[in-house]
Every structure is written in structure tokens, then in C-alpha cells.
Curated annotation (Swiss-Prot):
Belongs to the LAPTM4/LAPTM5 transporter family. This is Lysosomal-associated transmembrane protein 5. Disulfide bonds: none annotated. GO terms for cellular component: cytosol; lysosomal membrane; perinuclear region of cytoplasm; plasma membrane; protein-containing complex; transport vesicle. One of its GO terms (molecular function) is ubiquitin protein ligase binding. The keyword Transmembrane helix applies. It is a multi-pass membrane protein. The modification Phosphotyrosine is found at residue 259. Binds to ubiquitin.
Length: 262
């Protein structure tokens, strides 16, 4: 193996970086599809913030931008998958940028969460206009699972944009009046531990993608260097150039026969 490739670690915490990055890309592609389906269902069911009858130009623009955001996230995730499969390191850069921005937003959310407890820890029932065919507990469980999957991905801040709310986390944080002070403190401790665990997981994901990027880049550079060292094809000289070349006949040896046309 080339020394440059051996210098780049191909594992991250006992996992191969290419396999881990491929699994991460597939996971985010699936998350993009799930977010698109969920938002489409909310719009189709006439959610309060998405009613077409009460929608002006501003709300139409918000609706279009939300679907464009999901499409952009899908393209970034698909670019990561194609880059790993086809060894194109440049295709990994958009996802790396997304991971950096997501980590900074998660860190700011953690710091702001010490004011009030985030809403996704409280499984409150959603108000629905029509009776649902599914049990309420099942819907709560599915919503909670989707929230956990979104939290562990690089799309944590996406539901905030899709809710058409201003970018202020205090708008959707619950009030401390609904629970006792001791219970609120316990929930804050549990939330902090879980959120720090998620941040560590996000750092691990970034480390896997970064090492995969370095490995693919080194592998491509070694391949280009190897191809450049290949012997180039020698072009035979023309007849006039061959005549102008010095004779290679040894002294005293027989001369070559003269050129004659047939």
C-alpha cells in the first residue's frame, strides 16, 4: 500500500470510514424522504399554518421555500452517497458544511435550553380537525421516533423552518408552570445528558465523513501520480527525420541496403 494511504486512518472507533459514511448517507436520504412525506401530509390535511384558503403571497413563498429546503437536503445527502461510491471527494464537501452548521446550531440550542425545557421532550397530543383512524398512542410513538431520528441526524433545525415560525426557540419551548420545580430540574438533567450524547454522536459522524474525505482524496492523488508515471507512447520518426539521425552502424560493418521504391 502507498505510504500516503497508510498514513490516513481508514477506521474510526472500530468502524470503517467508507462503510460508516455510506450508512450515514443512506440514513440521511431516508430522513429527507420522511421529512418530505410528513410535511406533504401536514399540508394536505390543512394544518393551521398551511391552509391554502388563508394563504397569501408570503405564506406561498414560505411553503415553496420549505419544499425547496427538503429538496436541497436530499440533493446534499445524495451527493454524499455518490461521492463515497464513486470516489469523488468534492461531493462530500456540501455535507461536511451542513454538519458544521448543524453542530453549531445544536450547541446554541443546548445553551439556550437551560432557560426552558424543549418541547420535544413532552409528548403532547396534537389537536386534529377530524377523528383519526389510528390510536393516539401510536401516533405519539411515531412522532417521537421521527423526532429522535431527526435529532440524531444533521437535519435537527429543519422542523423549525418547516413550522413557519420565527427563528426564536423561545416561541415553542414549554412553560415551567405546567410541572413542579423538582420535576423540571430532573427533566433538564435528563435532557442535558441526552443532548450532550447527541452532540458527541454528531462529532463522531463528522469525524467519519472527514476521514473518508481525506482517504478518497489521497487515493485519487496516488492514482493520478501513478498514471503520470506510466511510460508515454513513443512516436516513430518520419523518413526525413530518420535520415537526419546519426548512423548506428558499427565501424567496419556492412552498410544498410539503399532505399528503393518497389
Amino acid at each position: 500500500m502507498d505510504p500516503r494511504l497508510s498514513a490516513v486512518r481508514q477506521t474510526c472507533c472500530c468502524f470503517n470510514v467508507r462503510i460508516a459514511t455510506t450508512a450515514l448517507a443512506i440514513y440521511h436520504v431516508i430522513m429527507s424522504v420522511l421529512l418530505f412525506i410528513e410535511h406533504s401530509v401536514e399540508v394536505a390535511h390543512g394544518k393551521a399554518s398551511c391552509k391554502l384558503s388563508q394563504m397569501g403571497y408570503l405564506r406561498i413563498a414560505d411553503l415553496i421555500s420549505s419544499f425547496l429546503l427538503i429538496a436541497m437536503l436530499f440533493i446534499i445527502s445524495l451527493s454524499l452517497l455518490i461521492g463515497v461510491v464513486k470516489n469523488r471527494e468534492k461531493y462530500l464537501l456540501p455535507f461536511l458544511s451542513l454538519q458544521v452548521m448543524d453542530y453549531l446550531l445544536c450547541l446554541l440550542t443546548l445553551l439556550g435550553s437551560y432557560i426552558e425545557l424543549p418541547a420535544y421532550l413532552k409528548l403532547a397530543s396534537r389537536s386534529r380537525a377530524s377523528p383519526s383512524k389510528f390510536p393516539l398512542m401510536t401516533l405519539q410513538l411515531l412522532d417521537f421516533c421521527l423526532s429522535i431520528l431527526t435529532l440524531c441526524s444533521s437535519y435537527m433545525e429543519v422542523p423549525t423552518y418547516l413550522n413557519f415560525k420565527s427563528m426564536n426557540h423561545m416561541n415553542y419551548l414549554p412553560s415551567q408552570e405546567d410541572m413542579p420545580h423538582n420535576q423540571f430540574i430532573k427533566m433538564m438533567i435528563i435532557f442535558s445528558i441526552a443532548f450532550i450524547t447527541v452532540l458527541i454522536f454528531k462529532v463522531y459522524m463528522f469525524k467519519c465523513v472527514w476521514r473518508c474525505y481525506r482517504f478518497i482524496k489521497c487515493m485519487n492523488s496516488v492514482e493520478e501520480k501513478r498514471n503520470s508515471k506510466m511510460l508515454q507512447k513513443v512516436v516513430l520518426p518520419s523518413y526525413e527525420e530518420a535520415l537526419s539521425l546519426p548512423s548506428k552502424t558499427p565501424e567496419g560493418g556492412p552498410a544498410p541496403p539503399p532505399y528503393s521504391e518497389v
